[in-house]
């Protein structure tokens, strides 16, 4: 009996060793894959453009959006249109001074757009909906209120989706949203959003968390083992307040948030790639006469760099716009210079997240920096 028992025991031992070897091999394989993955954490205040950057990675480095995904987005896009009209028209009575409809006969269309029928989740947005939207949106009073959108909360893509050409496309029964439609579609981000992609055999994992104050408590869960942080700020928000209250300037909120991230004890060795985003909207606002000094008094005494290469600046850039974009850049860089210990660095870039070519160029220029950070992280450099 003992002989047979010993043979069985030997077989069990051999099998256990074999299993242990397989486990060790898998662990080494997993560790190698884990260390090869470049983790990019997207942070920033609400509505800065973080989820748009993730969409761009899907367009640039994956297969883009399938027809099925595009059709699914159509509901969100039409919901955006409804929300735009409701937001602007509800704000009319709350502005100081308030604004009235230019044509009282549009009141009937307005009541329809405010009705419970239109706000149902299963609403099918018939021709009647788009006719009412057109009548109300082109009302002179509504247009006046729309021009004062910095006084309330209106999504950046309002002008894009409310353009008559886009409205005509969207009401077509077989319309399939294009990349710009999807990039500009606004859905409030809650929880973690992510994408994985490969560029020149290098594996990236880009992920982020909603930027509203209530979402930020989840950020700490994401800090572990990140290669770099991409901090996104909406430079165009200099004359706006945050959704959570009616007095905190959005850009100052971003500055405070950036300072907290830069000085966070868990992130003192993690460098930050700073996306100074929404440069297109910033330019539109400056060209329309919006004054930065009304919100940031220090803008009056600011002097932009003397060595600007104008050939690398956006075509048609006014001196005021160039001054504004570098003013905001330098406000963030002052934070990094104030408490710089040489353990992490900040790399600023001007971005327009809805511009695929711009994001392609910026990300390409960041890749070498990201890979260097990754090698330093694992002491391979």
From Swiss-Prot:
GO biological process: adenylate cyclase-activating dopamine receptor signaling pathway; sensory perception of chemical stimulus
Region described as G5 motif: 351-356
Annotated stretches, region: G3 motif: 204-213
Record-linked InterPro entries: Gprotein_alpha_S (IPR000367), Gprotein_alpha_su (IPR001019), GproteinA_insert (IPR011025), P-loop_NTPase (IPR027417)
Gene Ontology CC terms, in alphabetical order: cytoplasm; heterotrimeric G-protein complex
Chain segments carrying region G1 motif: 39-52
CDD domains per the UniProt record, alphabetical: G-alpha
Domain annotation G-alpha: ranges: 36-381
List of residues binding Mg(2+): 51, 189
Entry superkingdom: Eukaryota
Lipidation (S-palmitoyl cysteine): 3
Xref: SUPFAM superfamilies: P-loop containing nucleoside triphosphate hydrolases (SSF52540), Transducin (alpha subunit), insertion domain (SSF47895)
Region entry G4 motif, spans: 273-280
Keywords, comma-separated and alphabetical: GTP-binding, Lipoprotein, Magnesium, Metal-binding, Nucleotide-binding, Palmitate, Transducer
Segments for region (G2 motif): 181-189
A Pfam family it matches: G-alpha
Molecular function in Gene Ontology: G protein-coupled receptor binding; G-protein beta/gamma-subunit complex binding; GTP binding; GTPase activity; metal ion binding
Positions contributing to GTP binding: 44-51, 183-189, 208-212, 277-280, 353
SMART domains with a match to the protein in the record: G_alpha (SM00275)
The family this protein is said to belong to: Belongs to the G-alpha family. G(s) subfamily.
Cited function: Guanine nucleotide-binding proteins (G proteins) are involved as modulators or transducers in various transmembrane signaling systems. The G(s) protein is involved in hormonal regulation of adenylate cyclase: it activates the cyclase in response to beta-adrenergic stimuli.
Subunit structure: G proteins are composed of 3 units; alpha, beta and gamma. The alpha chain contains the guanine nucleotide binding site.
Protein name: Guanine nucleotide-binding protein G(s) subunit alpha
Organism: Geodia cydonium (Sponge)
